[in-house]
C-alpha cells in the first residue's frame, strides 16, 4: 500500500459511465479525466513555519472533488491511484 508523505493524499478515481444517456459508447479519447475520487491514504500533514505539524482536513474514506490535472498517476498491484497535495482537493462530498 502507498503511504503518502507530508500534505500528500492518495486518491482512487471514480470513473463515470462509459455510455451516454442515448446509448453511445465513448472511446477513451472522448472521456473526461475523472475529478471525483475516494481518499485511500493521507500523509502526516504539512509543517508550519513554527515547526508544528498541521493535520490534513481530509481522511481515509472521504469522497472528494479535485482539480482536473492535479497530481501524479501511479500504478500499484494493477490498481491506478492519483497522488496529489491536499491543496489540489477542492471539496469533500457530504
From Swiss-Prot:
Tagged with keyword Iron: no
Disulphide-bonded residues: none
Protein name: Co-chaperonin GroES
GO biological process, one term: chaperone cofactor-dependent protein refolding
GO molecular function list: ATP binding; metal ion binding; protein folding chaperone; protein-folding chaperone binding; unfolded protein binding
Species, as recorded: Brevibacillus brevis (strain 47 / JCM 6285 / NBRC 100599)
Entry keywords, A to Z: Chaperone, Cytoplasm
Classification via InterPro entries: Chaperonin_GroES, Chaperonin_GroES_sf, Chaprnonin_Cpn10_CS, GroES-like_sf
Family: Belongs to the GroES chaperonin family.
Pfam family, one: Cpn10
Gene that this sequence comes from: groES
Subunit structure, as described in the record: Heptamer of 7 subunits arranged in a ring. Interacts with the chaperonin GroEL.
GO cellular component, as recorded: cytoplasm
Cross-referenced NCBIfam families: PRK00364.1-2, PRK00364.1-6, PRK00364.2-2, PRK00364.2-3, PRK00364.2-4, PRK00364.2-5
Amino acid at each position: 500500500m502507498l503511504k503518502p508523505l507530508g500534505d500528500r493524499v492518495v486518491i482512487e478515481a471514480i470513473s463515470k459511465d462509459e455510455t451516454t444517456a442515448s446509448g453511445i459508447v465513448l472511446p477513451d479519447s472522448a472521456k473526461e479525466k475523472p475529478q471525483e475520487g475516494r481518499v485511500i491514504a493521507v500523509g502526516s500533514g504539512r509543517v508550519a513555519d513554527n515547526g508544528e505539524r498541521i493535520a490534513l482536513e481530509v481522511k481515509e474514506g472521504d469522497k472528494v472533488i479535485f482539480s482536473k490535472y492535479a497530481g501524479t498517476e501511479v500504478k500499484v498491484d494493477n490498481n491506478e491511484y492519483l497522488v496529489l497535495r491536499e491543496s489540489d482537493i477542492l471539496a469533500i462530498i457530504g
